[in-house]
Swiss-Prot record:
Cellular component terms (Gene Ontology): late endosome; lysosome; plasma membrane
Gene: INSR
Name by which UniProt lists this protein: Insulin receptor
CDD domains: FN3
Record PTM text: After being transported from the endoplasmic reticulum to the Golgi apparatus, the single glycosylated precursor is further glycosylated and then cleaved, followed by its transport to the plasma membrane.
Annotated organism of origin: Macaca mulatta (Rhesus macaque)
Compartments (UniProt record): Cell membrane; Late endosome; Lysosome
Amino acid sequence: VSNSSSQIILKWKPPSDPNGNITHYLVFWERQAEDSELFELDYCLKGLKLPSRTWSPPFESEDSQKHNQSEYEDSAGECCSCPKTDSQILKELEESSFRKTFEDYLHNVVFVPRKTSSGTGAEDPRPSRKRRSLGDVGNVTVAVPTVAAFPNTSSTSTPTSPEEHRPFEKVVNKESLVISGLRHFTGYRIELQACNQDTPEERCSVAAYV
């Protein structure tokens, strides 16, 4: 449960089949990385619009009114249909309006205008890759580099950064915890372990992810 923009109230139940007496719980939490697509998206595009929640009644043309009237006249001789209530009509209008708004939003997001070419200011419909003929490809010789086998030489590898220290909390005699100091609008992965001894760490259960 989110208590505020920087706190989470975590509650859990004890294991249904505990392996021994549960003495304490270990809670770890780790901030998740942001999606790269959120940074690549240009939010200043004119065509990018968010769907509006304002409701506007749909416009019904005269042709559709005549069509509905003719269908009603044809079916009037056979059977009588129950009229729709005001709530049913309002619900259908809201669904139709929401569907149109959502479709407009999809068109604005998916169909993004092509970037303009440098200098002219007009849209460049041509593809960016240059077309090559098969003759050009057949006359090209590619040299594949090989690595010489020197016994005293080792390849230089990129140094890996050490694992970031994950904050954790030891919870005793209760099944809840308030995690503070969190970043708003950010995803966190929370791990929970049930333990029956302080040491060693192998006395804890498999982590449950939240």
